[in-house]
Amino acid sequence: VKLFSGTPLSQFSDRPAEPQAPEAAGGAKPEGRKTAASKGAPKAGAPVARALPAIPEAPATTPVRVVPLARLAAGGRWRIEAMRSISEPLLLWFTRGQGRITVGGVTRGYGAHNAVFIPAGTMYGYEAGPQSYGNAVFFGRGCTLDLPAVPLHLRVREVGPQAELSGLIDNIQRELESGRPGAERAARHHLGLLGVWLERNGETALDGKKPDAARRLAARYTELLEGEFRSGKGVSDYARALGVTPTHLTRVCNQTCGRSASDLLHDRVIFEARMMLSETRLPIARIAEALGFTSAAYFTRAFQHRAGKTPSAFRRAG
């Protein structure tokens, strides 16, 4: 089961890794990311850079999947805890355990019988304890169902709705695993009923309250960050685009999720780096360039500061 549903990393170039820049030691803070000024034309007489492997476009559609929550963390807890988004709607149904989940820059606690719906492209990450159980429903890239346009966090306290939601998810999974003719189509019909369940129960989300100004700004920041984290922009650039000061943006992020604006940015970039290192054979220099770093050495220092090991050591560890 493929758990990562951004650009299909397995389709990246599978050329042998090219020679990479020497890796720097130490834990310096992330630096050396490209800015608009650093992306200009090369100086006259500069050597022409050798072309690096290209990253292809993602497919337009992906299948519906139901995945146990425990399996999402296979390969490392960073796969669920780091900030990221996926290009398809997602429902997390927690049936046991508790922890914290951050969606759109806002952190809340979750417990048993909590349903969290995350629209495509929405940044999220969550902590899961050893006793956390449930399922993740991936609606598929290209999903045309009428689904909520904003995230929902539903605390399902009544037994009836709990059983209804669990039954819908079981029906989807049963069809997908049956191998019978029309199973995919039947699963999508059950998925449509799941969308209706979200619509009916979503009316009570957050007690009908609209998000305050801080939460709206945090959501706008994470939405902007998700679209531009590869650009090399810093917090000051995002703050300018949002019409606020970097200090105010950082204060708001600390208020809504307990993390600074810079921490959210770096977490998102390094998550993508981890995925590219673990799921592709792209050279480290190509990954650094794709994520907006000015050199492989700067990328190595930033990665080691967050991940505790160099990019090549992380890749070797699998």
Predicted features and spans:
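…primarily DNA-binding HTH/wHTH and HhH modules…
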Residues: 1, 26-33, 37-38, 42, ...
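Membrane-cytosol interface segments
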Residues: 2-58
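N-terminal regulatory/effector-sensing and dimerization cores
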Residues: 61-152, 184
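Append "Primarily bacterial transcriptional regulators
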Residues: 113, 237-244, 249, 253, ...
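Amphipathic alpha-helical segments enriched in hydrophobic/aromatic residues interleaved with Lys/Arg
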Residues: 150-202, 222-223
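Basic, amphipathic alpha-helical hairpins
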Residues: 174-181, 197-205, 221-234, 252-253, ...
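A short, Lys/Arg-enriched amphipathic alpha-helix from helix-turn-helix/homeodomain DNA-binding modules
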Residues: 209-242, 247, 264-282
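Terminal helix-turn-helix DNA-binding modules in bacterial transcription factors
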Residues: 255-295, 316-318
